[in-house]
């Protein structure tokens, strides 16, 4: 069984507006059978942090196109995207690159 993890989740570029305007969240993910990965984190975020308009953040089982994801300041595409296994004290940053005009 995977132990609970403490992770910093941050939203920027306007994405924080979907989370009551709160940019930084220090969360404890509960222990579970399988290791925590980004796919599971997104499900947890949708259930526990996302306050409105989930379609602006989630598309299918991933983030919407136009949302940049950084894990410990590295592009998630270099780390396996949804399959990246979270480690205790990881930092995950979601930045919306879509802006109205």
UniProtKB/Swiss-Prot annotation:
The keyword 4Fe-4S does not apply. It is found in: Cytoplasm. GO terms for cellular component: cytosol; nucleus. GO terms for molecular function: protein tag activity; sulfur carrier activity. Its main location: cytoplasm. There is a cross-link at residue 101 (Glycyl lysine isopeptide (Gly-Lys) (interchain with K-? in acceptor proteins)). Keywords: Cytoplasm, Isopeptide bond, tRNA processing, Ubl conjugation pathway. Transmembrane segments: none annotated. Pathway: tRNA modification; 5-methoxycarbonylmethyl-2-thiouridine-tRNA biosynthesis. The modification 1-thioglycine is found at residue 101. InterPro entries: Beta-grasp_dom_sf, Mopterin_synth/thiamin_S_b, Urm1. C-terminal thiocarboxylation occurs in 2 steps, it is first acyl-adenylated (-COAMP) via the hesA/moeB/thiF part of MOCS3, then thiocarboxylated (-COSH) via the rhodanese domain of MOCS3. It holds the Pfam family Urm1. One of its GO terms (biological process) is protein urmylation. Acts as a sulfur carrier required for 2-thiolation of mcm(5)S(2)U at tRNA wobble positions of cytosolic tRNA(Lys), tRNA(Glu) and tRNA(Gln). Serves as sulfur donor in tRNA 2-thiolation reaction by being thiocarboxylated (-COSH) at its C-terminus by MOCS3. The sulfur is then transferred to tRNA to form 2-thiolation of mcm(5)S(2)U. Also acts as a ubiquitin-like protein (UBL) that is covalently conjugated via an isopeptide bond to lysine residues of target proteins such as MOCS3, ATPBD3, CTU2, USP15 and CAS. Belongs to the URM1 family. Component of a complex at least composed of URM1, CTU2/NCS2 and CTU1/ATPBD3. This is Ubiquitin-related modifier 1.
């Amino acid at each position: 069984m995977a132990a609970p993890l403490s992770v910093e989740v941050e939203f920027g570029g306007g994405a924080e507006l979907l989370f009551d305007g709160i940019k930084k969240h220090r969360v404890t993910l509960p222990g579970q059978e399988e290791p925590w990965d980004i796919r599971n984190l997104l499900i947890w975020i949708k259930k526990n942090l996302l306050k409105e308009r989930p379609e602006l953040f989630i598309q299918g089982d991933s983030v919407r196109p136009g949302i940049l994801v950084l894990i410990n300041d590295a592009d998630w595409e270099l780390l396996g995207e949804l399959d990246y296994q979270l480690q205790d004290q990881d930092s995950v940053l979601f930045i919306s690159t879509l802006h109205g005009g």
